[in-house]
Amino acid sequence: MSIIDIANNILRKYCLCDRCLGRLFASLGRGLSNDERGKAIKIALVLELHKRYLDGDKDSLKQLVELSPNIGPIAVNLIKNLGIEIEYTPRTCFICDNKINDIIDTYSQRIADIINERHINSFVLGIRGVTSYIRKEESIANEFKLLYWENIKRELKREIGKKIQMMTNAKVDFLNPEAMIIIDIDRDRIYIESPSLLIYGRYWKLGRMISQNIWLTKNGVKKYPLSIEEIAKMLVKDGFGDDVVLHIAGREDVDVRTLGSGRPFVLEIKRPRKRNIDIKDIENRLNSISRWLKFELNMFVDRDFVSRVKKGCRTSYKIYRAIVVADRDIGIEDIKRLEEFFRDRIIEQRTPTRVLRRKKDVLRRRKVFEIKTRVISPRVFEALIKCEGGLYVKELISGDNGRTVPSFSSVLNANTLCLTLDALYVHEYI
């Protein structure tokens, strides 16, 4: 059966707009929109019936008159030109109720306005809803055993996407879009999910009693006056995005400063309001909030980079500076013995007593590569400690009542405590 015969049978029963008719034959022909395809099929059908009428088939004219309300003006105008008066009342499309063009135009404009406002450079489109339209077109496809039709959602995605690209500088990108746009036609809603902006950088803690995360007591009061997370979340108030998350290479205690090379981290801005932001604007904003924290932002990264940063902290080495106090005088021989003993030494640590309430009691093995020491006073000395990531340095010094072995205390046969601790270098494997 020819396309014209199939279209004839369909239009005898259903009024269809050009787009919805063309969509039933969407896989036939190249370079045509469904609107053009449907109009061409209607014209071809009208021409064929007119030809048959001119060839003497009087039933063809009757057939054309019967079809005209479902075909539309193309058929009606021909019938009138043949001198036949007919009453014509436009009918609505059985599938889309004559709404599909309005849907395409309206949502294209709304989304284009959003894209221009947010400076989005690439997007991918999805459609929800239109279930009643889908049900109707599926019933026609099944009734007439159509093989070349396409779903209305597919046409809406394609046509709205094309118009958006014409109205903006944004392009469709299926692999790495800056925005995922979902149109819920039944609810008349547009949802825009922008993939997070991920920015790699480093931070420095120039003071003590600064936590990485906001730490609240049971009463909801901040336990520490300042946190890195708190500073980062200022970006939400400034309108950079809906939320901010920090992915940090390891952590240090609140009373430990981070100096030297700083600590690597990735700043994640969720659902960013704009994509083409200047990293230095964010860096300047972060650095303007507290003189006790310094940030340096270097580059945009992908999600895989975040994993490498977090994984690298477990395999990298770190250098700390500790000020240590002992309960007896420490001489030059003690210092030499300490340095020699902790050269490439494996340390066994059970979870420190001070964190047992929130961490599982497990045995960890970490390596101390070397230490360098300098006597400050008879019972106070400075130690530079190069060690594997994940080592509890305070417990390396104190021994934690035998939970860390060996320790400074066990080697020196003295009670030693860490007075202050600074992280000087965090090596990266990324």
Curated annotation (Swiss-Prot):
It holds the Pfam family Pus10_C. It comes from the Archaea. Substrate binds at Y320, Y392. The keyword tRNA processing applies. HAMAP family: Pus10_arch. Belongs to the pseudouridine synthase Pus10 family. This is tRNA pseudouridine synthase Pus10. It comes from Ignisphaera aggregans (strain DSM 17230 / JCM 13409 / AQ1.S1). The gene is pus10.
